[in-house]
Amino acid sequence: MSVIDQNAIAVGPRISEADVGDYIALLKPRVMSLVIFTALIGLLIAPGHFHPVLAITSLLCIAVGAGASGALNMALEGDIDSLMSRTANRPIPRGRVTRQEALAFGITLSFFSVLTLGILVNWFAGALLAFTIFFYVVIYTLWLKRWTAQNIVIGGAAGALPPVVAWAAVTGSIAPEPVWLFLIIFFWTPPHFWALALFRTDDYARAGVPMLPVVAGPDATRLQILLYTIVLVAIAAAPWPLGYFDAVYGVVSLALGAGMLWLAIEVFRKRDRIPSLRANRKLFGFSILYLFALFATLGLEAIARMIAPLIW
């Protein structure tokens, strides 16, 4: 037997070590949970009756589409993930799943989610979901993230689309209400992720990702966080006086906005290392609570309107 034959036998075909948990990790469950939540609010506030089976189908398809995007993102960012401590334990850097397996998994789920939503619900929603996946995978992952400090600003559009897709699933159209939801998430994304990037700057620099703190420095990032937070608070409060959302939402948005703005000011003010790290972490954590509470208020208002005729 030749040396080549012996080597071929020794190497052999790679046997995947992945288990179910690894494939679940590819879906980015935390991101999926946020997508499902914001999409659910889009469904709840949409006008008209929507059959529960179609509602569940829509949420499932949007969730699977988000998971597909996550899997494709990990497949295309395996080189970056392996260099960052925050992502080094993901399935691909650990060698549990190959990039080819993740690509196949993500592509399969993408087609399944889009086709199922289009066939069973409506093709407008299916097309929006397809665009969301495309934008996240191609525009953000392959282009923006690697080449510009505005990566999460422009790329944030993908994360802001799920409630729009959900509204379209119910109505087959787009209206001002889902556009407001889109804008809230869009302007929420930069302060949220830049706060994370401020205490993960070394991680991003090591991986060569041009996040704003790496490219422009922490002071410029703090200013941008404050400016985007001011816009976010204004955008989030605007639907109330304009008549799109109720007064309860308006009061909650102002209260949450005050907290968000205060923490953004703290991030801007505190420049020493330890106080700065604490301020960044507080803003990052509160921003999650901010978005959840804001959207939950809309959802609870919608549920209250649904059950009011049954009570009175």
Curated annotation (Swiss-Prot):
Membrane-crossing segments per the record: 34-54, 56-76, 119-139, 152-172, 179-199, 225-245, 248-268, 283-303
Location within or outside the cell: Cell inner membrane
Predominant location: membrane
Keywords per UniProt: Cell inner membrane, Cell membrane, Heme biosynthesis, Membrane, Transferase, Transmembrane, Transmembrane helix
UniProt GO MF annotations: protoheme IX farnesyltransferase activity
Note, other: Carbon 2 of the heme B porphyrin ring is defined according to the Fischer nomenclature.
Family the UniProt entry places it in: Belongs to the UbiA prenyltransferase family. Protoheme IX farnesyltransferase subfamily.
Protein name (record): Protoheme IX farnesyltransferase
Species whose genome carries this gene: Bradyrhizobium sp. (strain ORS 278)
